[in-house]
Amino acid sequence: MPRSQRNDNFIDKTFTIAADILLRVIPTTRREKEAFTYYRDGMSAQSEGEYAEALQNYYKAMRLEIDPYDRSYILYNIGLIHTSNGEHAKALEYYFQALERNPSLPQAFNNMAVICHYRGEQAIQQGDPGTSEIWFDKAAEYWKQAIALAPNNYIEAQNWLRITGRSEDWE
């Protein structure tokens, strides 16, 4: 039984019903419907912390989905799982792939910045201020791109850019 038919919470059930109605009304191919079902089941598993199951569903969706925009969200969600698992290098790869297909994903830029900032903090703890500055500069670059796409979001990042003197070419 597909995961979407096993949802226990109201929001997931509502989303599933709405998605099923849309799939019936909007003209789509069988392949597109199947890709969306895997994507939806992946999101459901991911929201419950079932990352292995979510990844399986996302990989199946990727094999079926041909639309670059839709693929960007699948790749982004795979990146989220790798971020949650602490696999930052892998997460960055998936965020890059998502942005190649859809350069208007501010959340991918934000997540890349967060990873770079984290690595900068790690470098400081390891007594390597030079490397930390490289990571912080990279974080600033990604946050500026996220903010350019969503100027009313990422307030903490905007403050960090100002406080650290990295906002000069952004504001």
UniProtKB/Swiss-Prot annotation:
HAMAP family: Ycf3. It comes from Psilotum nudum. PROSITE patterns: TPR (PS50005), TPR_REGION (PS50293). It is a peripheral membrane protein. Keywords: Chloroplast, Membrane, Photosynthesis, Plastid, Repeat, Thylakoid, TPR repeat. GO terms for cellular component: chloroplast thylakoid membrane. InterPro entries: PSI_Ycf3_assembly, TPR-like_helical_dom_sf, TPR_rpt, Ycf3/AcsC/BcsC/TPR_MFPF. It comes from the Eukaryota. This is Photosystem I assembly protein Ycf3.
